[in-house]
Amino acid sequence: MTTLATLIFLVTLLFVLWQPKGLDIGITALTGAFIAVITGVVSFSDVFEVTGIVWNATLTFVSVILISLILDKVGLFEWSAIHMLHASKGNGLKMFVYIILLGAIVAAFFANDGAALILTPIVLAMVKNIGFSKRAIFPFIIASGFIADTTSLPLIVSNLVNIISADYFHVGFVRYFSRMIIPNLFSLLASIIVLWLYFRKAIPKTFDDNNIKHPKDAINDLKLFKISWIVLVILLFGYLISEFTKIPVSIFTGIIAFIFLMLARKSNAVNIKQVIKGAPWNIVLFSIGMYIVVFGLRNAGITLILAKILEYISNYGLFSTILGMGFISAFLSSIMNNMPTVLIDAIAIGQSNVHGMLKEGLIYANVIGSDLGPKITPIGSLATLLWLHVLTQKDVKISWGTYFKTGIIITIPVLFITLIGLYLTLIIF
């Protein structure tokens, strides 16, 4: 059973990351799940249990991405980025910091995938338009992709990993926010400092801002642009209401996304069919399929091994517990992707004999490691692989070697500082 469960998991993961001939990750994961079921590695009751765990998370994620795609077509993100350029007043370092801050805001409210895949092309087009050299463009591209994950901690909806973990342990919106806002601020500050130290020689000191277009020129539909702000406010209230009513957050995000789609249908700036097609629907199939495969590892007793390791680490106190869990999840995410990692770790945490604040430390450290760890390698998250593909289409080629060399140097210190932020949060608040 153990060998079979491990083999099914590894082969499924290999095909998910490899994607031969464009094989859809949803189909791959469901195939792995089907094999796991027919071989008896998982039962039909496991299938229903997995569906119960991931349906809210994945539908929330898809809804948020749908909303962000409409906002992108309206021009909200480009409008924001142009404001950042104007605020920089020709100062290269200010522009670098402001772009990072914008990325952090977008990641918080529209998920890491939305920030990386929507904001990066906008930033790339802008720095090219300003006339930056390839050497000067690289820091801005890396920063846009890096910050999308490192600051995707504050809200449950900021990352699919967050939603899945919060759902698994029944953590509400407000409680989650109260525990992760300080680590997110630590991560943001650490990211700015580490990225600046790493790229300081490549970032231009000044740039010509005379030819930058006016922010209003980025708006493709003024009426829908104004409505967008109302939608964002309602979305935030929806998150809060879900906390107190115990109604799944996907219900609120789904209704808001549907209404926004109906309003956008009349806009010439938004191609509804293109927006719906662009949503990551395959993530729903991938999540269900991959987690069924992961449940096979649980049934085979593999997650119990990790649970014992976590119990051992917890004997050394809260600080060691947080650092240990954070770096374990970061390492696992970097070598086998953060999606299966977060659930494997969550199952192990649930199986471990750890309680109280120590268990809370494990839960949130797992999220932090699974959010930040993927930046170490290109295979750490599906968003990174897609991000690299988008850049290649725009004639910006980043080799896996270059990415790894950059990723490991800038991720490790940021991860450590972020975990310190979590530790301080738990002992003070």
From Swiss-Prot:
<feature type="transmembrane region" description="Helical">
    <location>
        <begin position="275"/>
        <end position="295"/>
    </location>
</feature>
<feature type="transmembrane region" description="Helical">
    <location>
        <begin position="408"/>
        <end position="428"/>
    </location>
</feature>
<feature type="transmembrane region" description="Helical">
    <location>
        <begin position="3"/>
        <end position="23"/>
    </location>
</feature>
<feature type="transmembrane region" description="Helical">
    <location>
        <begin position="99"/>
        <end position="119"/>
    </location>
</feature>
<keyword id="KW-0812">Transmembrane</keyword>
<dbReference type="GO" id="GO:0015105">
    <property type="term" value="F:arsenite transmembrane transporter activity"/>
</dbReference>
<feature type="transmembrane region" description="Helical">
    <location>
        <begin position="50"/>
        <end position="70"/>
    </location>
</feature>
<dbReference type="Pfam" id="PF02040">
    <property type="entry name" value="ArsB"/>
</dbReference>
<feature type="transmembrane region" description="Helical">
    <location>
        <begin position="244"/>
        <end position="264"/>
    </location>
</feature>
<protein>
    <recommendedName>
        <fullName>Arsenical pump membrane protein</fullName>
    </recommendedName>
</protein>
<keyword id="KW-0813">Transport</keyword>
<feature type="transmembrane region" description="Helical">
    <location>
        <begin position="222"/>
        <end position="242"/>
    </location>
</feature>
<keyword id="KW-0472">Membrane</keyword>
<dbReference type="GO" id="GO:0046685">
    <property type="term" value="P:response to arsenic-containing substance"/>
</dbReference>
<keyword id="KW-1003">Cell membrane</keyword>
<dbReference type="InterPro" id="IPR000802">
    <property type="entry name" value="Arsenical_pump_ArsB"/>
</dbReference>
<comment type="function">
    <text>Involved in arsenical resistance. Thought to form the channel of an arsenite pump.</text>
</comment>
<comment type="similarity">
    <text>Belongs to the ArsB family.</text>
</comment>
<feature type="transmembrane region" description="Helical">
    <location>
        <begin position="25"/>
        <end position="45"/>
    </location>
</feature>
<feature type="transmembrane region" description="Helical">
    <location>
        <begin position="180"/>
        <end position="200"/>
    </location>
</feature>
<feature type="transmembrane region" description="Helical">
    <location>
        <begin position="137"/>
        <end position="157"/>
    </location>
</feature>
<keyword id="KW-1133">Transmembrane helix</keyword>
<keyword id="KW-0059">Arsenical resistance</keyword>
<feature type="transmembrane region" description="Helical">
    <location>
        <begin position="316"/>
        <end position="336"/>
    </location>
</feature>
<feature type="transmembrane region" description="Helical">
    <location>
        <begin position="372"/>
        <end position="392"/>
    </location>
</feature>
<dbReference type="GO" id="GO:0005886">
    <property type="term" value="C:plasma membrane"/>
</dbReference>
